[in-house]
């Protein structure tokens, strides 16, 4: 069954989320290797962003305690606290949650489109490292289809905002950014988003990054209203400008009290990183806004999107039902075919026995074959119709398993791929 363990801004604070975050691929790989050794876990992937850690898996049976214990040990967090905080979803609930995440209905900023790229990256990493197979591939691709349908059929992503844009919006409330210089620390996706929103607000940006070439490349994309420098010169910039937006993947705070001097003018620090980049004392001239603080601004946008969100949840509900209907269809049709094939084989076998024993003339063989086939087709007609009527219904799994047992079909369904995937595992590409 599908399984999901979720830690988000809804059930954990930023201090706990930053401990759980997977800031590098090595840590993510280590965790997935650990949990994939469990006998009940067949496939798994991890989505890790500033606002969430999602463990998505395909399992034989529930194993939340093992997964959470593994996460707690790796991240040095109390297991009982994690179990208490975790939202756990099973099967249809897990798929509905995954579709909601992909469609940005579960985001801090409803309608932001960043999560689709983050899910794609998480999926690609899991596929590349052999943690993800056909089960999760089918689910993730269906999640992408659902997200596209939500975007196309609602206005949920119109004028969409991210945490970075919320930070810039908050800065605009504090001062006119026109012609001001703002320092963006980090040249990754979140840093780039912040820089773009700042430029759109009329500000000029200075990109600071450990990798100078990456900062230069970002400035080339941003255009003439940007410049760049090495993160080594951070202290100089911290004590020269007013607005700072920090979005690095550093494991520890990079802006500390030792770097920030007392100045006569106000400075505003926006920490949009998880783990947090900024650990300084606030005073009358220094204000710090972390990810959770920005939720206040986010709330102002939620009312505007409430109606669209209701429409989107309707789509997600229908797509979740359709997903399981499709899986049931994939399972039922080969069983119907296998039963008919089994009946045909038995009929042909008995016909040959009758011919050998002289119960039937060779000249009557074809007519007898037609008659026998018509009989078993007529006999199987009602069971076939009833099986088809089960498609998409809750009891279908029970009936499918019963039919496999009764007709001894366990080893006769090699052609059945219940979780048919639309992802080329060799080339990491879609094969629609």
UniProtKB/Swiss-Prot annotation:
Organism: Campylobacter jejuni subsp. jejuni serotype O:23/36 (strain 81-176)
Site residues (Important for activity), renumbered to this chain: 97
Domain statement: Possesses an unusual extended V-shaped dimeric structure with each monomer consisting of three distinct domains arranged along a curved 'spinal' alpha-helix. The N-terminal catalytic domain specifically recognizes the glutamate moiety of the substrate. The second domain is the NADPH-binding domain, and the third C-terminal domain is responsible for dimerization.
Pathway(s) of this molecule: Porphyrin-containing compound metabolism; protoporphyrin-IX biosynthesis; 5-aminolevulinate from L-glutamyl-tRNA(Glu): step 1/2
One Gene Ontology biological process: protoporphyrinogen IX biosynthetic process from glutamate
Top-level enzyme category: oxidoreductase
Name the record gives this protein: Glutamyl-tRNA reductase
EC number: 1.2.1.70
Single annotated GO MF: NADP binding
Family, as annotated: Belongs to the glutamyl-tRNA reductase family.
Active-site residues annotated for this sequence: 50 (nucleophile)
Function of the protein: Catalyzes the NADPH-dependent reduction of glutamyl-tRNA(Glu) to glutamate 1-semialdehyde (GSA).
Keywords tagged on the record: NADP, Oxidoreductase, Porphyrin biosynthesis
Any matching Pfam family: Shikimate_DH
